[in-house]
Regions:
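Short, basic/aromatic recognition patches
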Residues: 1-6
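Alpha-helical substrate-recognition element adjacent to the catalytic core
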Residues: 7-109
Length: 109
C-alpha cells in the first residue's frame, strides 16, 4: 500500500513537515520577475500571478532525494505559503517531481 494515500497520516506515528518553496523547489526567473521590486509592496494580484506559474519551478534534487527517503519511515506533509489558487498546479508539481504520481498531503495558506 502506498504511503501517499489519504490515510497515511494514521498509519505512521510521526509526521515530517516539508516546506516547498526554496526547499524542494526553486523559483525560475520566469516566476521571479512577476514580483514587485523590494519596497514597492505587493498586491494579492501579484502573488496570484507569481503562484500560478509555480509549475515552472526547478526541482532541488538533492533535497527531494532526502524527502523520498523519509517516506520510508514517516508521513510527509508538504506546506507552502502559496495561495489556494495554485493548489492544483502545486499538487501536480509534487506528483511529477516528488511523490512519483501519488497524491501528496498538502497544506496551503
Amino acid at each position: 500500500m502506498s504511503i501517499f494515500n489519504k490515510h497515511a497520516h494514521q498509519e505512521r506515528p510521526y509526521i515530517v513537515i516539508v516546506d516547498i518553496d526554496g526547499t524542494i523547489s526553486e523559483a525560475t526567473e520566469d516566476r521571479l520577475h512577476l514580483l514587485p521590486p523590494p519596497g514597492k509592496g505587493a498586491l494579492t494580484k501579484d502573488w496570484n500571478e507569481f503562484n500560478l506559474v509555480c509549475d515552472t519551478d526547478t526541482p532541488i534534487t538533492p533535497v527531494i532525494d532526502i524527502v523520498r527517503q523519509l517516506f520510508n519511515v514517516y508521513t510527509v506533509w508538504f506546506v507552502t505559503g502559496r495561495c489556494e489558487i495554485a493548489r492544483d498546479k502545486t499538487r501536480a508539481w509534487l506528483r511529477k517531481y516528488v511523490t512519483n504520481g501519488a497524491e501528496p498531503l498538502l497544506s496551503m495558506r
